Amino acid sequence: MSERAHIPVLVEECLALFAQRPPQTFRDVTLGAGGHAYAFLEAYPSLTCYDGSDRDLQALAIAEKRLETFQDRVSFSHASFEDLANQPTPRLYDGVLADLGVSSMQLDTLSRGFSFQGEKEELDMRMDQTQELSASDVLNSLKEEELGRIFREYGEEPQWKSAAKAVVHFRKHKKILSIQDVKEALLGVFPHYRFHRKIHPLTLIFQALRVYVNGEDRQLKSLLTSAISWLAPQGRLVIISFCSSEDRPVKWFFKEAEASGLGKVITKKVIQPTYQEVRRNPRSRSAKLRCFEKASQ
């Protein structure tokens, strides 16, 4: 795993949110490679129970090895947000953390199919590799109208209609199985000016496919409807998002929860990475952190 995969996003800001009331119990529902977990366990000796979960078995294996030093304080489970929502909560937590979206480890492992930097690699994109549906299944089986909806709703792709049409046209002659196949099918769709921007034209298409394959909108809904009930009084829920389709529902859910008297929004203004962090870790540039504190009673 590359060194970049070891860099947790907005880690200092996360730690600072718990500085006044150091946590004793914590639930990390996107454990990943264990970057945030390592920082919390090192910074807070009071934290004797850190329950980490992830959908990705490969990530869990990396995290277990990385967190060996803290093995008596941390537990690991293979679970999605939906799984956790449907299970009894083992305890109440002083903090809950969700770092949404795809991890650097998943992007850098080209065989996982999350990155358009690959070529011959399979177009997979499954966070949980025990599930059946892959991104290539989606592109080869769904109707043009449904593909367009996915590109529009989950990727906010301006060329969603022509992209869907291009996929359907391409697959009449050849199945879309690899990352190179996607490039051949779609790169002619985008206007030239989009190739001169910082964000590659395929970024939004890949985002849309990933969100659909992994049911990320449904998973986020499960998290939001359950997470406050996992918190102890004055416990804090921290959610880091990377695109507007993730951040919008978090923002509105926190506002509604505050209006309902469940607690208060701590981040009246969203927290974003500093210039220094973005230089150190360019993938952090679109990160947005929001925090909600549960009421004391």
Swiss-Prot record:
Quote the HAMAP family the UniProt record gives: 16SrRNA_methyltr_H
Family indicated by similarity:
Belongs to the methyltransferase superfamily. RsmH family.
Would you name any one GO CC term? cytoplasm
User: What is the annotated localization of this protein?
Assistant: Cytoplasm
- Alphabetical list of InterPro entries matching this protein: RsmH, SAM-dep_MeTrfase_MraW_recog, SAM-dependent_MTases_sf
> Does the keyword Cytoplasm feature in the UniProt annotation?
yes
Detail which positions bind S-adenosyl-L-methionine: 34-36, 54, 81, 99, 106
**Key words, A-Z:** Cytoplasm, Methyltransferase, rRNA processing, S-adenosyl-L-methionine, Transferase
Q: Which reaction does it catalyse?
A: cytidine(1402) in 16S rRNA + S-adenosyl-L-methionine = N(4)-methylcytidine(1402) in 16S rRNA + S-adenosyl-L-homocysteine + H(+)
Q: Which organism is it from?
A: Chlamydia pneumoniae
Give the primary localization class: cytoplasm
Q: What name has this protein been given in UniProt?
A: Ribosomal RNA small subunit methyltransferase H
Q: Which GO terms describe its biological process?
A: rRNA base methylation
**Pfam families according to UniProt:** Methyltransf_5
Q: Does the keyword Methyltransferase apply?
A: yes
The molecular function terms of the Gene Ontology recorded here are: rRNA (cytosine-N4-)-methyltransferase activity
Q: What is its EC number?
A: 2.1.1.199
Q: What is this protein's function?
A: Specifically methylates the N4 position of cytidine in position 1402 (C1402) of 16S rRNA.
